[in-house]
Amino acid sequence: MHGAPSGKSNSDGTPIDVYTIVLNRLIQEQGCICAYCMCRIPEKGKKATIEHIDPQSATSEEKALDYRNMLAVCNGNRDAHNDKEKSCDAHRKNAPLSVNPLKSDTLSSLKYLSNGEITASDDAIKKDLCDTLNLNCSERRIPENRKAALTAY
């Protein structure tokens, strides 16, 4: 379905790319920020993808198409040959998550350390942040960028 036309067309006859429309809307709603690592997502280009909170492989088609199950995420260094260099959904693949950036209990569990690393008071969320999503990926300089943002305040 990624990038596939919907079967509908604009008034000039060009196909409507529903995937791109949804992705662009998610990016705008999230302020051009990746839902996981919080890096900037450029508004143009193939630098983002739609992430499903509940993986498509483990849910119904209806849930997979539910807008409330979707997030815009960066490419997570998807083309890296080594998994330790990947983050976000590129590192997650289809693993289930306890962390959900749309839920207040997830957000209240988050902690940022002075070295720029992210952790959580909830052990399951901490495992998702550090292991499943690899959000302290030094190869992508995620902690370093977080630390720079914290010291800029």
Predicted regions and their residues:
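Short, charged surface segments at domain edges that flank catalytic/cofactor-binding sites
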Residues: 1-36, 59-65
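Short Fe-S-cluster ligation motifs
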Residues: 62-78, 102-120
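Short, well-ordered strand-loop elements centered on a beta-strand within folded domains, enriched
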Residues: 82-89, 116-128
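C-terminal, charged low-complexity interaction regions
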Residues: 124-153
